[in-house]
UniProtKB/Swiss-Prot annotation:
Keywords: Aminoacyl-tRNA synthetase, ATP-binding, Cytoplasm, Ligase, Nucleotide-binding, Protein biosynthesis. The lineage of its organism: Bacteria, Pseudomonadati, Pseudomonadota, Betaproteobacteria, Neisseriales. GO terms for cellular component: cytosol. It comes from Neisseria meningitidis serogroup B (strain ATCC BAA-335 / MC58). Monomer. GO terms for biological process: glutamyl-tRNA aminoacylation. A motif ('HIGH' region) lies at residues 9-19. HAMAP family: Glu_tRNA_synth_type1. InterPro entries: aa-tRNA-synth_I_cd-bd, aa-tRNA-synth_I_codon-bd_sub2, aa-tRNA-synth_I_CS, aa_tRNA-synth_I_cd-bd_sf, Glu-tRNA-ligase_bac/mito, Glu/Gln-tRNA-synth, Glu/Gln-tRNA-synth_Ib_cat-dom, GluQ/Sye. It is an enzyme of class 6 (ligase). This is Glutamate--tRNA ligase. Belongs to the class-I aminoacyl-tRNA synthetase family. Glutamate--tRNA ligase type 1 subfamily. The gene is gltX. ATP binds at K245.
């Protein structure tokens, strides 16, 4: 059997990080088992689904690098209405579905009664049964189509995350599978799609647990093989509450990109939300695919920790090739009006500075002063700069100007003799020198920084 999983987002807004985590686990499960990972766009909500939102999903999947095997044949539910109608007709013909002519007023009365009695909402008055007389068909009501849910027994499955789950069928409604206008409903479309796509494992959020028995019963009615189900725990915010944009939480995957998070780091972090492989925190996607098993997914909710995300991002920045980092940093430098990054070469700059920043925006800040001197912070000026420091910088510039070989080692060899002559410690030279050349007191080794910036530019900045 070829394992087939799917990710099935609705294009009604941004691509949520919870959705990306679901896609990641589905993708990793398929890749681990040498199977297929498929994408389906559930766009039957015509009022809310937009082409822009579809593009947001596709762009988000591309950004994080979750490649799907049906890229040339993505399934769109709105293109499958004829297929849904065909299956509904089959269910009606075989007696697994029926027309319901209840008015809105009747349904509202049933709903109120059900809330009081704790029973299923619909009283099945239009459900055909042996010896039962159905009401007279009203002339002013367009019928919906309802599925005939079994009245006895239980619907159960062994959830790949939550374990054994059993739901009494008497607790289930005869759900609507086609609205009065003929459009199919969510739970029905999902079943037909999973069946036609050959999905073997449905991995999704645990907010879908209640949909599962309904979908299993429909699958049985169409004589389909049942997929296995795994329901993933919710992701909570740092306060332990449901993630919400309204609460100020970052929820859209594209927002994390704007924050300077690498896609590899984002996936690494999301993988650790609810899944664990020993104490491993930092790993590649190749390792994740090798290690991933749904039995290692906790059924308990996970909590966001932005500090941990940034730490993981910093670790990924360290191992990212400088050429790739340069392409990511250049647009951020361009926003600061830095368009020429040849002198010094940006890749050389990144090699020097990339061990400290934990996001690409901060990394760009670290590169900035190699091309343009920053305006020093007032606190740094107060602490490290005065008239004597200014005079000392001019004297040290003369030593620098006398160097024939301009490299970090030659520059470093000037420090101790100069400090001895001046009767100062290295801090009295190094910190003002950083301010004079870079405009900041926080840089990597100052000799390496000066070597990269170049002799002419260093002398120009000191003497400015």
């Amino acid at each position: 059997m070829t394992v087939k999983t799917r990710f099935a987002p609705s294009p009604t807004g941004y691509l949520h990080i919870g959705g990306v985590r679901t896609a990641l686990f589905s993708w990793a499960f398929a890749r681990h088992h040498k199977g297929e990972f498929l994408l389906r766009i559930e766009d039957t909500d015509l009022a809310r689904s937009t082409a822009e939102s579809v593009n947001i999903i596709l762009d988000g999947m591309k950004w994080v690098g979750l490649n799907y095997d049906n890229a040339d044949n993505v399934v769109y539910q709105t293109r499958r209405f004829d297929r849904y109608k065909e299956v509904i007709a089959e269910l009606l013909e075989k007696g697994h579905a029926y027309y319901c002519y209840c008015s809105k007023e009747e349904l509202e009365a049933m709903r109120e009664k059900a809330e009081k009695e704790g029973s299923a909402t619909y009283d099945r008055r239009w459900r055909p049964e042996v010896g039962k007389t159905l009401p007279e068909i009203p002339s002013d009501v367009q019928p919906v189509v309802r599925f005939k849910t079994p009245l006895d027994g239980v619907t159960k499955w062994t959830d790949l995350v939550k374990g054994e789950i059993s739901i009494p069928n008497e607790a289930l409604d005869d759900l609507i599978i086609a609205r009065a206008d003929g459009t199919p409903t969510y739970n029905f479309c999902v079943v037909v799609d999973d069946y036609d796509m050959g999905v073997t494992h449905v991995i999704r959020g645990d907010d879908h647990v209640n949909n599962t028995p309904k979908q299993i019963n429909i699958l049985k009615a169409i004589d389909a093989n049942l997929p296995e189900y795994g329901h993933l725990p919710m992701i909570l915010n740092e306060q332990g509450k449901k993630i919400s944009k309204r609460s100020g939480d970052t929820v859209a995957i594209t927002d994390f990109g704007a924050m300077g998070i690498l896609p590899e780091a984002m996936l690494n972090y999301l993988a650790r939300l609810g899944w664990a492989h020993g104490d491993d925190e930092f790993f590649t996607m190749e390792q994740f695919i090798e290690w991933f098993d749904l039995k290692d997914v906790s059924p308990s909710p996970s909590r966001m920790d932005l500090k941990k995300l940034y730490w993981i991002n910093g670790e990924h920045i360290k191992i990212t090739p400088n050429g790739k980092l340069a392409e990511l940093v250049k647009p951020r430098l361009a926003l600061r009006d830095i368009h020429e990054t040849e002198k010094p070469a940006l890749e050389d700059v990144l090699e020097l500075v990339k061990d400290r920043p934990q996001d690409l925006n901060t990394l760009a800040d670290e590169c900035f002063y190699f091309y343009v001197k920053q305006t020093p912070a007032e606190a740094d000026v107060q602490k490290h700069w005065d008239d004597e420091a200014a005079a000392r910088m001019l004297r040290f510039a003369e030593r620098l100007e006398g160097l024939e070989d301009w490299n970090a080692e030659a520059i470093h060899d000037l420090f101790k003799p100069f400090c001895d002559e001046e009767g100062i410690k290295m801090g009295k030279l190094g910190m003002p020198l950083r301010l004079a050349v870079c405009g900041t007191a926080k840089t990597p080794s100052v000799d390496a920084v000066l070597a990269l910036i170049g002799k002419e530019e260093v002398l120009k900045r000191i003497r400015a």
